[in-house]
Amino acid sequence: MNYLENFLTTDEEQEIVSAIRMAEKNTSGEIRVHLERSTSEAIDSRAKYVFHALKMDNTKLENGVLIYIAIENKKFGIYGDKGIDRKVDSNFWNKTRDVMQRHFEAGAFKTGIVEGIKSTSKALEKFFPWETNDKNELSNEVSKGEV
C-alpha cells in the first residue's frame, strides 16, 4: 500500500489546500501540512526537523505552523514558529491537537486536519492579521515524503 498517496483522496487534499487558502486570507501567518510514511524519531522532534527542512522558519514574522503526520506510526505533531508560539497561551497547541485527535480516532483524517487548520487560523488571525502588502510566503500544497 502506498501510504502517502492513499492516506487522503485527491478531493480531500484539495479541501485541505482550500482550508489553508481560506485561513491565509485573514492572516499573514503560513500553514502547511506534511505527510510522511513513518518516523523513528519522537514526533515533536520530527515535526520540528521537517518544519526547518521545508524552510518554514523563513517567514518574515516567524509565524509559520506545520501540521506533521507520520501515517504508519499513527502520530502527528503541530509545530509553530517562534513568533506564534510566543503569542498563544501554553495550552493552545494541546487543545488544537486534542480537536484533531478526536477526528483522527474516528477515521476522519481530512476533517481532523481541516479543524486543526481552522484552530490555528484563529490564533494567527488574532496575533498576525492579514496586511495589505501580505504575500504568500510558502506553498499551500500538502507536502509528502521524507525530507
Predicted feature locations:
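A structural boundary signal for the start of the first folded domain, especially the loop/turn
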Residues: M1-G64, I69-V147
